Amino acid sequence: MTERELLTAGLRELGVAECPSAADNLLRYSEILREKNKVMNLTAITDPTEIVTRHFLDCAALAPYMPQDGRVLDVGTGAGFPGMPLAILCPQTEFVLLDALRKRIDFLNEVIADLGLTNVTAVHARAEDYARDNRDTFDLAVSRAVADLRVLSELALPMIKVGGAFLAMKAEDCTEEVETAANARMILGAPDAEVLHYTVPFDEVSRA
């Protein structure tokens, strides 16, 4: 299968509606990522097929949970995961990609400009600093492979509106981490965490 065929089939398996330009934009994003990765440490995954499965389709698993016409914060976005693929797949949702490293934000701004995306903004800031002026601002927060869930909860939850949610992408066996974060959730007034398991199409690894 080509990367395009793999992407289209994987999105279909995940039940993600693909807007007309999504595949083109994701594959272009992959090109820019691989090119910039030659001079910047953006990702350890450089094979085009693995970028589709282990980055794009993994992130796309969250697409059904994105609030239409809502605001989503990606905490510690790195090279744009999961926020950038989600912004491409969910054009009616507004995304803010937050990272403390300026070179990553410069890269993301280049991707945004190249793809002509209008629903995503890359912000250079530490989460604890950004939170001071953005409490109760977002309908949803997401993160992927950033930090311990207890720390993430303390950073992200204050920026989420009442009734919103925080989706933290973790390894399949994250029970201990979820339990350790329980006190932070309680102090911040968040409900008990729910662990959802899923398998990425064309990838043998299960995630949570």
Identify what each model region corresponds to.
Residues 46, 123-126, 196-197:
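Short loop/edge segments at beta-strand edges and connector loops
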Residues 146-149, 174:
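Short beta->alpha connector loops
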Residues 33, 86, 170:
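Residue-level signal for inorganic ion chemistry
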Residues 173-208:
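Active-site capping/gating segments
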Residues 90, 160-162:
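Helix-to-beta-strand junctions that scaffold the AdoMet/dcAdoMet cofactor pocket
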Residues 2-73, 103-106, 110-120:
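Class I SAM-dependent transferase core
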Residues 163-173:
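Conserved beta-strand signature within the Rossmann-like core of class I S-adenosyl-L-methionine
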Residues 57-146, 153-154:
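Conserved SAM/SAH cofactor-binding pocket of Class I
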